Curated annotation (Swiss-Prot):
HAMAP family per UniProt: Ribosomal_uL11
Similarity section: Belongs to the universal ribosomal protein uL11 family.
GO cellular component annotations of the record: cytosolic large ribosomal subunit
Lineage of the species this protein comes from: Bacteria, Pseudomonadati, Chlamydiota, Chlamydiia, Parachlamydiales
Name under which the protein is recorded: Large ribosomal subunit protein uL11
Description of post-translational modifications: One or more lysine residues are methylated.
Function comment: Forms part of the ribosomal stalk which helps the ribosome interact with GTP-bound translation factors.
InterPro entries assigned to the protein according to its UniProt record, in alphabetical order: Ribosomal_uL11 (IPR000911), Ribosomal_uL11_bac-typ (IPR006519), Ribosomal_uL11_C (IPR020783), Ribosomal_uL11_C_sf (IPR036769), Ribosomal_uL11_N (IPR020784), Ribosomal_uL11_N_sf (IPR036796)
SUPFAM superfamilies linked to this entry: Ribosomal L11/L12e N-terminal domain, Ribosomal protein L11, C-terminal domain
Length: 142
């Protein structure tokens, strides 16, 4: 028999750096989960990915136990890492912060496609390019 799910919590947590401070502590505390047990388990599982922000789905069960699934970093984080920028543009239609080619966007889409709502690689590439555009990263011809 499966456990009864009480709550599903979505958080973005830096890999290997979970701690009881907000936003993790209040979200898990409200659900009655042992916060330190989650932090230790999460940090142990994500130690190798240090530096990345990971979207995490935490499933809380009726007996206050939990399980979690980590996904690939958000497309915006992957773009910032690939282009070596700290953040996107504040005014993306006027100030461009970097340039990207379609093949670079395709590489990011290949890495992220399992977490995306896209039917194929071409659609995933277009999603990555849309995110890049909204961050002030310009598409250039190859």
């Amino acid at each position: 028999m499966s456990k009864k799910v009480v709550k599903v919590i979505k958080l973005q947590i830096p890999a290997g750096k979970a701690n009881p401070a907000p936003p993790i502590g209040p979200a898990l505390g409200a659900a009655g989960v042992n916060i330190m047990a989650f932090c230790k388990e999460f940090n142990a599982k994500t130690q190798a990915m240090a530096g990345d922000v990971l979207p995490t789905l935490i499933t809380v069960y009726h007996d206050k136990s939990f399980s979690f699934i980590t996904k690939k970093p958000p497309v915006a984080e992957l773009l910032k890492k690939a282009k070596g920028i700290a953040k996107g543009s504040g005014v993306p239609n006027r100030d461009k912060v970097a340039k990207i080619t379609r093949s670079e966007a395709r590489k990011i889409a290949e890495e992220k496609i399992q977490d995306m709502n896209a039917a194929d690689l071409e659609m995933a590439t277009n999603i990555v390019l849309g995110t890049a555009r909204s961050m002030g990263i310009d598409l250039i011809k190859e």
